[in-house]
Structures are given as C-alpha cells and as structure tokens.
Amino acid sequence: MENDAGENVDLYVPRKCSASNRIIHAKDHASVQLSIVDVDPETGRQTDGSKTYAICGEIRRMGESDDCIVRLAKKDGIITKNF
C-alpha cells in the first residue's frame, strides 16, 4: 500500500508466536509480548541487547506459556541448561 507521498507503508504486520510459530491475529487479545533485556552484572544497568518473545492466546489458554518461555530462554542462553 502507498501513502500520498508514494512511499510503501504497511498498515499491519502480523506477529508469529515464538513457541508454536502460529500467526498472532489482530483480534487475539490474549496474546502477550515479553522483552527481556541484557543487564551488565557489575553496574546492574541495561545494555544494548534484548530478546523479544511473543506468546499467542492459545498457548496461554492451555496454561503452557510459562513452560514455553523457559524453553525459549534456555535455547537462547538466558537461563542455564540445568535450570
């Protein structure tokens, strides 16, 4: 879609669930997006790095969101493997 200036713009870019790879629809009001930032261990301040997880409403409805977040965080190295 183009605006008045002739630039390409997207009105809506759908997100995908990080746990199940399902598309999160615009009307999925039960979905959440979590941003986990990297913290400097010496100063306790936020660094430039971050990781974002999107969990769809269906995963939350089944009560599996906490397990999915732990699994994704282990895979990305945020949580140790023997947690």
Curated annotation (Swiss-Prot):
Domain of life: Eukaryota
Cellular component terms (Gene Ontology): cytosolic ribosome; cytosolic small ribosomal subunit; ribosome; rough endoplasmic reticulum
Key word rRNA processing present: yes
Subcellular location: Cytoplasm, Cytosol; Cytoplasm; Rough endoplasmic reticulum
Keywords on record: Cytoplasm, Developmental protein, Endoplasmic reticulum, Ribonucleoprotein, Ribosomal protein, rRNA processing, Translation regulation
Signal as UniProt keyword: no
GO MF, one example: ribosome binding
Pfam entry (one): Ribosomal_S21e
GO biological process: cytoplasmic translation; endonucleolytic cleavage in ITS1 to separate SSU-rRNA from 5.8S rRNA and LSU-rRNA from tricistronic rRNA transcript (SSU-rRNA, 5.8S rRNA, LSU-rRNA); endonucleolytic cleavage to generate mature 3'-end of SSU-rRNA from (SSU-rRNA, 5.8S rRNA, LSU-rRNA); lymph gland development; regulation of cell population proliferation; regulation of translation
Transmembrane domains' residue ranges: none
Family: Belongs to the eukaryotic ribosomal protein eS21 family.
Function text: May be an associated component of the ribosome rather than a core structural subunit. May act as a translation initiation factor. Has a role in regulation of cell proliferation in the hematopoietic organs and the imaginal disks of larva.
Quaternary assembly: Component of the 40S small ribosomal subunit. Interacts with sta.
Protein name per the record: Small ribosomal subunit protein eS21
